[in-house]
Regions:
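Glycine-rich, acidic/polar active-site loops that bind/position phosphate-bearing ligands
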Residues: 1-330
């Protein structure tokens, strides 16, 4: 193991002088290990840059807090009360205020570790939250940040007497935890090649989407790496089940968000929060580059709910995803 250069990072939420030193795997001969996920992402980023492009990435990670003192997994008690959460509180300001001590410590640790934590929201599940990380033109750092953020959340939760999980589907009836990846591409002049001044975005954006959709079934193992991951990928659960794309459509696997043209990008919504961020970003960037270089054309963007339409299906089980991955030439 050799340090990545990101650290040592002091654990701000513990009293002892303890630090984390992120490392990468190397072979005895001194070469980087071919199975190191960070190295795989570095290799893909190198290919994107060799094509004259710079990927810009931002991540969104969802997680659940739970009561570690209870028998079985249960939602947490609301701080300052003896009341347990009994329902989700989507976008609740009151809930964020109640957990302010927890989120304040999250932001303090992120600032100390140069993890660009931005907006925090309460999600639809009981004790479920999401934190957005700001975009960066360093895709490897984006993956580092996502991994470090998960470490921070778990550690700060322990400080507050809570548990935190990024499991894809911790509760059978509540929403799963997603890892959403926003991506745009800059040319050598720094211009966003996905922006052509329209809401639809440029033909290059369409080609990137085509690459994503074409490779998505074969790549699902990266996005859903565990048996539990496939419990999240179910219809009507705020998670995609098809290789599909749409304009500002949250049932799609690939969403083109509304907003300023200069920020035109795609949002990849398949991955669970349990996925390896290095492998997810590597797979997404490689797929987008494949589509761009082939000048591929995607199917027509769908409207409405993807759950109600005949669209190409993603693997529905771990076994199916393994078979698709093993026989893929991507």
């Amino acid at each position: 193991l050799k340090p990545t250069g990101r650290g040592p990072l002091q654990l701000t939420w513990v009293d002892d002088d303890v630090s984390l030193l992120p490392c990468q795997m190397y072979l005895h001969e001194g070469e980087i290990s071919p199975i190191d996920p960070r190295a795989q992402l570095e290799a893909v980023v190198g290919k994107v840059r060799a094509a004259g492009l710079t990927p810009v990435c931002a991540t969104e990670l969802e997680f659940y807090l739970y009561d570690v003192a209870s028998t079985g997994m249960q939602p947490p008690l609301i701080p300052g009360t003896a009341s347990r959460m009994t329902a989700g509180s989507l976008y609740s300001i009151d809930l964020l205020e109640a957990f302010k001590g927890f989120t304040d410590d999250i932001y303090a640790a992120c600032e100390a570790w140069d993890v660009p934590a931005d907006a925090a929201i309460s999600e639809s599940g009981m004790g479920q939250f999401e934190v957005n990380l700001l975009h960066t033109d360093d895709a490897v750092k984006a993956a580092d940040d996502a991994l470090l953020f998960k470490f921070i959340v778990r550690g700060v939760a322990r400080k507050h007497g809570l548990g935190a999980t990024f499991m894809a589907k911790p509760y059978g009836e509540d929403a799963g935890n997603g890892f959403h990846l926003h991506t745009s591409m800059l040319d050598q002049s720094g211009a966003n090649i996905f922006d052509n001044g329209t809401d639809l975005g440029s033909p290059v954006l369409a080609s990137a989407v085509a690459g994503l959709l074409d490779t998505m079934p074969d790549s699902t193992l990266f996005f859903a790496p565990h048996l539990n991951s496939f419990r999240r990928l179910r219809e009507g659960t705020h998670a995609p089940t098809t290789a599909s794309w749409g304009m500002d459509n949250r049932t799609a696997a690939v969403r083109i968000p509304a907003g300023p043209n200069a920020a035109r990008r795609f949002e990849h919504r398949v991955s669970g929060a349990d996925a390896n961020p290095y492998l997810v970003i590597a797979a997404v960037l490689a797929a987008a580059l494949k589509g761009i270089e082939a000048e591929a054309t995607p199917p027509v963007a769908f409207t409405g709910s993807s759950y109600d339409q005949e669209l190409p299906r993603l693997p529905a089980s771990w076994e199916e995803a393994l078979v698709r991955f093993e026989h893929s030439d991507f």
